[in-house]
């Protein structure tokens, strides 16, 4: 992925959580800066939060795509024409969050000779706006794509990673074991007691700071977040 990014005019790098996308960004930037110390590099992402995370993880200044392109919203909600980027390398993270309009502005603003690297997870939900940009770029077959499929965030043989992949492909024949368990209960009160018991058990084992308790319900119910 790093070799292709440094030596290609356009590249897509896609992979799920924990496959090394962030590490690859850092390595791409380190190698590119060592080869081209005077190069102008633009790091950007569709949202402010994603841009801040990109800046923290790479150590390079990062901004939103809108700000990088000088896109200002008018009173009617439309945007002015984007500015042409002054860059030798443009690195875009979280591309799956980019809609077709923002992608159009970005691609028209890439100067001739500039290298463009698009990074994201094609299996994430598409953008709120129209167009599944990342998935459609990959599907067109005209753009070089590097797929990261080895997961480093979980241990080798993790059922969490294996089951996430099965679910993404609509397969519910999941694998169960110590690191992936399922408890079925039709009674909310029984479920709440079971959750409390499991939480106390796991916090005693791993410590409070290392155990997360999540609920799909915001409402104040037996299994809500209250």
Q: Which stretches of residues belong to each language-model region?
A:
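Walker B catalytic acidic pair
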Residues: 93-94, 120
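Conserved lysine of the Walker
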Residues: 21
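Pre-Walker A (Motif I) flank of P-loop NTPase domains
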Residues: 7-13
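Conserved helicase motor core of P-loop NTPases
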Residues: 4, 123-226
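The conserved Walker
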Residues: 17, 95
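Hydrophobic positions on the alpha1 helix immediately C-terminal to the Walker A/P-loop
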Residues: 24, 28
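Inter-Walker segment of RecA-like/P-loop motor cores
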Residues: 40-89
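N-terminal pre-P-loop "Q-motif" helix
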Residues: 1-7
């Amino acid at each position: 992925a790093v070799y292709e990014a440094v030596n290609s005019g356009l590249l897509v790098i896609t992979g799920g959580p924990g496959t090394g996308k962030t590490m690859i960004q850092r390595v791409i930037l380190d190698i590119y800066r060592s080869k081209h110390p005077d190069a102008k590099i633009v790091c950007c992402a569709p949202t402010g939060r994603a841009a801040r995370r990109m800046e923290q993880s790479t150590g390079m200044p990062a901004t939103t795509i809108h700000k990088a392109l000088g896109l200002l919203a008018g009173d009617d909600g439309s945007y002015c024409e984007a500015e042409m980027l002054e860059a030798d390398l443009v690195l875009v993270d979280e591309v799956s969050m980019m809609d077709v309009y923002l992608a159009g502005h970005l691609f028209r603003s890439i100067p001739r000779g500039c290298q463009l690297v698009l990074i994201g997870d094609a299996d994430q939900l598409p953008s709120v706006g129209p167009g599944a940009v990342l998935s459609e770029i990959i599907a067109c077959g005209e753009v070089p794509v590097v797929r990261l499929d080895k997961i480093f965030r979980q241990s080798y043989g993790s059922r969490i990673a294996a089951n996430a992949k099965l679910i993404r492909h609509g397969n519910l024949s999941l694998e169960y074991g110590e690191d992936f368990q399922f408890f079925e209960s039709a009674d909310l009160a029984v479920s709440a007691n079971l959750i409390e018991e499991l939480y106390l058990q796991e916090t005693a084992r791993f410590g409070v700071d290392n155990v997360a308790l999540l609920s799909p319900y915001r409402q104040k119910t037996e299994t809500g977040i209250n």
